[in-house]
């Protein structure tokens, strides 16, 4: 899980979703998981 100021899609499987006001990237590649911090 990477915590960064600006979350971006890394590959085509990445999806940007908003959960409880937190922007997240979910992907089948675990290294692409991100959260806005």
Swiss-Prot record:
Keywords: Ribonucleoprotein, Ribosomal protein. The gene is rpmJ. It comes from the Bacteria. Coiled coil: none annotated. This is Large ribosomal subunit protein bL36. GO terms for molecular function: structural constituent of ribosome. Disulfide bonds: none annotated. GO terms for cellular component: cytoplasm; ribonucleoprotein complex; ribosome. GO terms for biological process: translation. SUPFAM superfamilies: Ribosomal protein L36. Pfam families: Ribosomal_L36 (PF00444). HAMAP family: Ribosomal_bL36. It comes from Vesicomyosocius okutanii subsp. Calyptogena okutanii (strain HA). Belongs to the bacterial ribosomal protein bL36 family.
């Amino acid at each position: 899980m990477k915590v960064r100021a600006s979350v971006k899609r890394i590959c085509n499987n990445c999806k940007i979703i908003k959960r409880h006001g937190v922007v997240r990237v979910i992907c089948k590649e675990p290294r692409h998981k991100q959260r806005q911090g």
